[in-house]
Amino acid sequence: MFSDERSKYKSWGNLKKQMNNLLCDALKNKISYFYTTYREVHNTYGRATINCERKELVAFSWQIRYEQWEDEYKILNNTNVDIQHLGSLSAVWERQKQIQEELSKEKWMPECILCDGDFIFAVTEYLKTNITSALNSDNYILRVFAYMDRRVGKRTLIKIKEDAEALPEWVKQFYLIRCEAEGL
């Protein structure tokens, strides 16, 4: 999921403004987004958060993601990829990449072990995605943004209740915050 989107956008201020403009009226002064990079640190690592009334609800940090990469590396080394069966080194790399993507999607997304790059990737993706696709996305960060979006009305919130309640707690909390703000 991680993509180096940091090099593809002009400024965080512009993205933040666009995201704030998409917040529903009930959440305008409650929800805030934070993102920073530490330019003096190797690879300009950073930190991103989504806050509600100045309380940090979820954080995306390179430190957490680094621990994830270590775990994935250990799993990949213990995964038997049959080199002879796949035929070429590029096929082996492709299979390892596929295994890594499966690990990331299945384990790390539900546990919210994501980095600042995942957050920026999700923001830039969200701004290009229609609201229906975001509400049904496998990317939980896109769903979080969609739950707080002004384009999602009360009827839609009621329709997606069962789906939202089956999601991990860190995602569900944003659905509940929106419903509470709307009086549902």
Where are these regions (language model features)?
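Alpha-helical scaffold segments
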Residues: 1-184
